[in-house]
Amino acid sequence: MPRIKQFVSFLSIILFLGASPAFAKEDTPETLDGTTKVSAEKLIEVLQSSPDLVVIDSRKPSDRAKGFIEGSVALPNTDTNEASLASNIKSKTTPIAFYCNGIKCGRSYAAAKIALGLGYTNIYWFRGGWDEWTQKGLPVMKN
């Protein structure tokens, strides 16, 4: 019986530490120089006013499988490079919007930084990402 108590105590400590804010993912920065940060509503406005806007879903395939913004291109940040961007975007002045899971997900931030470094100049960053989109009840697609 003492072993079970030890195990339960150990498990309780692990669960407590896992729930601790010290172990929570940090928020992404508020801004990314060289990009225009947009809300869900602003992204919709840009989509309506810029038909050539390319929306990049920087999330992992397992996240995208749960749903995505209609018309977005699946391009995880880990696969974002000169060749993958060039194959999805007409020119370095074409408007691009990057999104991921939300403010605690750094994937769209990382992908937008890569695009900036490669000379893309018309970048929107949807920092609130999937979390904001779904919390506002906006339409989603699923495969």
Each model region followed by its residue ranges:
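Extracytoplasmic/secreted cell-surface and envelope-processing proteins
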Residues: 64-66, 106-108, 134-135
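Active-site neighborhoods of enzymes that stabilize oxyanions during catalysis
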Residues: 138-143
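Sec/Tat-exported extracytoplasmic proteins
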Residues: 47-51, 100, 116, 134-137
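Catalytic cysteine-centered active loop of the rhodanese-like fold, especially the PTP/DSP P-loop
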Residues: 84-131
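N-terminal, post-signal-peptide region of Sec/Tat-exported proteins
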Residues: 48-84
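Conserved functional loop/turn residues at catalytic and ligand-binding sites
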Residues: 68, 119, 137
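Flexible, polar/low-complexity N-terminal or interdomain linker segments that lie immediately upstream
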Residues: 2-54, 61-63
